[in-house]
A protein has these predicted regions:
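Bacterial N-terminal signal peptides that target proteins for export
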Residues: 1-3
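C-terminal motif of bacterial Sec signal peptides marking the signal peptidase cleavage site
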Residues: 11-14
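An exposed, glycine/acidic-rich loop-and-rim segment of catalytic or binding clefts
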Residues: 16-52, 58-257
């Protein structure tokens, strides 16, 4: 009853974006309007008073483009993404996705909660990566599934993913929300929330790839990166964290200066 009620709620509160002119990114809304997994997909455009623009699709809760002004005031797209829904639905990628249930790796594809062992997909070197993400034989991982649209305004969209108990091996019926808000100080606020009826694990994130050149054919070797981090978590040959917390000083992971 619980799960049926939340499914109905998600569907009843879903709404369509207001009709707008085509985004300045050059993306075509029609190229994202399709039926996938029995649900409608679309492209939603968020704007602010400064002319900044963010395009989002409800397939995987993905940020498709972020248009920002360069030093000369020219608008440029600074994230990597596809220009149509077909590529997102058929080419494995995490471009701009709202990843779940569990971003990153779970060692050996196994979790234990209250002495109950749950086997998860082992889709990456024997580990469970990004919720077991795959397109075949069936879409798995939230980044490959269609979200419901609960709310959309000029500068905000709320996307809902209803995940049934046992999906990809994870326990608990989960209702997860991803809220993207484009603020007037040119920030993108991302808020994730989730509720469940059983003890489970949740670790959501966004998976944008940035290229600040605006020209996605250019390398990013001219970028400057600063991370206020003194330590990092080393990984083994399968990219699984070892449990060690190591200093960044003297390593290629030092971006503190």
């Amino acid at each position: 009853a619980f799960f049926g009620a939340i499914c109905a709620l998600a569907m009843l509160t879903a709404c369509n974006a207001p009709q707008k002119s085509e985004p300045i990114s050059g993306l075509k809304r029609a190229d994202f309007q399709s039926e996938q997994q029995g649900k409608q997909t679309d492209l939603y455009t968020l704007t602010n008073k400064n002319g900044m623009e963010v395009c989002v699709t409800n397939f995987g809760g993905r940020i498709v483009s972020i248009m920002v002004p360069d030093k000369d005031g020219n608008m440029q797209d600074v994230v990597i993404g596809y220009s149509n829904i077909t590529d997102y639905a058929t080419k494995p990628s995490d471009f701009g996705a709202s990843v779940g249930r569990y971003a990153n790796r779970i060692a050996n594809g196994v979790i234990t909660i209250d002495d109950v062992v749950y086997d998860l997909p082992k889709n990456n070197f024997g580990h469970c990566l990004h919720g077991g993400c795959t397109l075949e034989p069936a879409p798995m991982g939230w980044q490959n599934q269609v979200f419901d649209v609960e709310k959309v305004t000029d500068n905000q969209i709320v996307l809902v993913k209803v995940s049934p108990d046992g999906e990809a091996g994870f326990p608990g019926n989960v209702v997860a929300k991803t809220t993207y808000t484009l603020t007037d100080d040119n920030a993108i606020d991302i808020v994730w929330t989730a509720t469940t009826d059983k003890k489970t694990v949740i670790n959501q994130t966004n998976h944008c790839y940035f290229n600040l050149n605006g020209d996605h054919q250019m390398p990013i070797t001219n970028h400057l990166l600063q991370l206020n981090a003194d330590c990092y978590t080393p990984v083994d040959s399968t990219y699984m964290t070892t449990g060690e917390i190591a200093p960044v000083a003297g390593t290629p992971m030092d971006f503190s200066a």
